[in-house]
Amino acid sequence: MCSCYKEIDIIIVGGGHAGTEAAAVAAKMKCNTMLITQNIDTIGQMSCNPSIGGIGKGHLVKEIDAMGGIMGIAADNSGIQFRTLNSSKGPAVRATRAQIDRKLYSSLIQKILSNQKNLYLLQQEVIDILVEKNKIKGVVTNAGLIIKSKIVIITTGTFLNGKIHIGNKQYVSGRSGEFSSIKLSQILKEKFCFRINRLKTGTPPRIDLKSVNFSKLESQYGDTPIPQFSFMKFVGIRPKQLPCYITYTNKNTHNIIIDNIKHSPIYNGSIKGIGPRYCPSIEDKVVRFSKKESHQIFLEPEGLNNYEIYPNGISTSLPLNLQIKIIRSIKGLESANITRPGYSIEYDFLDPRDLKLTLESKIISGLFFAGQINGTTGYEEAAAQGLLSGINAALMLKNGSFWFPKRSQAYLGVLIDDLCTLGTKEPYRMFTSRSEHRLIIREDNADLRLTEIGRKLGIIEDDRWNNFYNKKNIIYKEIKNLKNTKILFNKEEKNKINLNINKSGSITAEEILRRPEITYNDLICYNFIKRKLKDEEIIKQIEIQIKYAGYIKRQEKEINKKTYYDNIILPNEINFKKISGLSKEVIEKLNIFKPTSIGQAIKISGITPAAISIILIWLKKNNLMYNK
């Protein structure tokens, strides 16, 4: 072995969506950072669907952008169709989703990283980690390189002991056509005793664009004006916008699957890993929803200069000959040719309960994990974890501090709290329904929630900060102006817009805007106010803050109650067996989950209010009642 590199501050293992965010933010925080990946050309690659965002996921992308991350900007510059989902519903569940030119996206990510100061790229496979006295010291590569570092972040995605299944064929791979990382998985499990389990995910076959009969299909176009992920104004020329197309499976499709279900690795026992509940294979859909006559399929373009179509909704691991039959049984795809077969992939993942909320390991100091290795599914969940791990790795080096958002601050807070407190037995996907504070942590206010924090952490550059600061001031001043603008009505005007006003015949502009049917622009049309803001995003923000003020205050009161328990620390060295009055079940669960606060302990199934009271009394009695 040879050691020909000077000591690096932070090493990131893996160049996917978690690894790229971790590398970018760590380098931005002036740490000497190295990203090691098996193939530099596939950095930032979209392994499965050519899209970013969606319900819950779009919220994460907005939060990443608000904190100075790179996914949002890259998506805005490579998007070929943008839509706002749930646009007719309330602001809490509205979400941005974009179809992405996958080649353009990865090239943009690579360009951002190549231009980032303090960041070095290395094409190698990491096969071991160096540890002394439970502290990380570096990594070992397959070429025999020893690279010393103060911190290591592992972001291996599905590559950790990955195995691909197509029918009865199986082969070791981290992604189709790429090597799996077997030795690193063995080291983590056998040498360092991490709890390692198996998960499974899948992808549909790709279809030759030229072989699709689009005249038989329903078109779906993007929104105008085009929504975006980044809070920075888009500058430049957008890529050409393309439609998606909709088709459906049918009785013939379902019969092919049912008649050949024994050839599915999911149903013949070949696959042991648990797959994503909210992104099931077409085999699962047909079996589990047997009374359903059809399933919707979205035919999504893979890019402007790409000849392939991604059929979203028919992930499968059936043999290739059956995949062809299934595809050709569908309207518009009767003559379709498959360019790449669909497959399922099993891979190892780490039990996230072995991690702190910073995503640092509880077992080895200075070792972080982020992305699918922690049991999540999706680019957005991975990228959010990468950002958090990179921030905390840099903070640890600088002054030993740390940062993570609470559940009431961000969907990222919900994500890490769910994972690190409760763990997961299936690929974890973010939804707005996972948050009990979704009216507070909306897509539209991600910058108002997080950009100031990012500035304090040193990851928000001046142009973004100035943009945010101006926006925040405009919103604050305009809401104040609306509250102070009193309007006098005569009887005719009052009846015209059906207003209930007080006896004096006056009402503020803010009170009028509270009404659900009144918009900010209505105030101008009725000559209630003379000024006019031009920025539609600022106008929307003002409307939301005023119209939902009562509901928001109610949620804030609930948050304050929960914060008390979240702030009471449970010391690492606490021995729950010594706390008299706790049942064996409670002690067992506390030792398994290892909560770091009373707030975390409360969320564990089986931990009773009585048990929490006993622990609180014990902490007070032993002078261990510390707040964060």
UniProtKB/Swiss-Prot annotation:
It is found in: Cytoplasm. Pfam families: GIDA, GIDA_C_1st, SAM_GIDA_C. Gene3D superfamilies: FAD/NAD(P)-binding domain (3.50.50.60), GidA associated domain, C-terminal subdomain (1.10.150.570), tRNA uridine 5-carboxymethylaminomethyl modification enzyme MnmG/GidA (1.10.10.1800). The keyword Cytoplasm applies. Its cofactor is FAD. It comes from the Bacteria. NAD(+) binds at residues 275-289. Its main location: cytoplasm. FAD binds at G14, G15, G16, H17, A18, G19, V126, S181, Q372. GO terms for molecular function: flavin adenine dinucleotide binding. GO terms for biological process: tRNA methylation; tRNA wobble uridine modification. NAD-binding protein involved in the addition of a carboxymethylaminomethyl (cmnm) group at the wobble position (U34) of certain tRNAs, forming tRNA-cmnm(5)s(2)U34. NCBIfam families: mnmG_gidA. This is tRNA uridine 5-carboxymethylaminomethyl modification enzyme MnmG. The gene is mnmG.
